[in-house]
């Protein structure tokens, strides 16, 4: 979804992504940086781990980490904003 069509929550989520995720994940490609690229993450049938990309699974991985990905400290609002942004990719 083009940035011009984002709502306020998605725009806040993009800011959370820049602060917490961008150093390890590209947003507009599936090519890996330190972690997998996030393009179409919520639209694929399985994440690189093989698990489905449900909001619940994305929340668990974000908050608790997995493999090389560390746990991330986010407020509930930041997490919801980030999920809204991930759905735009």
Predicted regions mapped to residue ranges:
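The canonical Cys-X-X-Cys-His
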Residues: 13, 17-28, 82-86
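Pocket-edge positions in alpha/beta enzyme catalytic cores
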Residues: 5, 50, 71-74
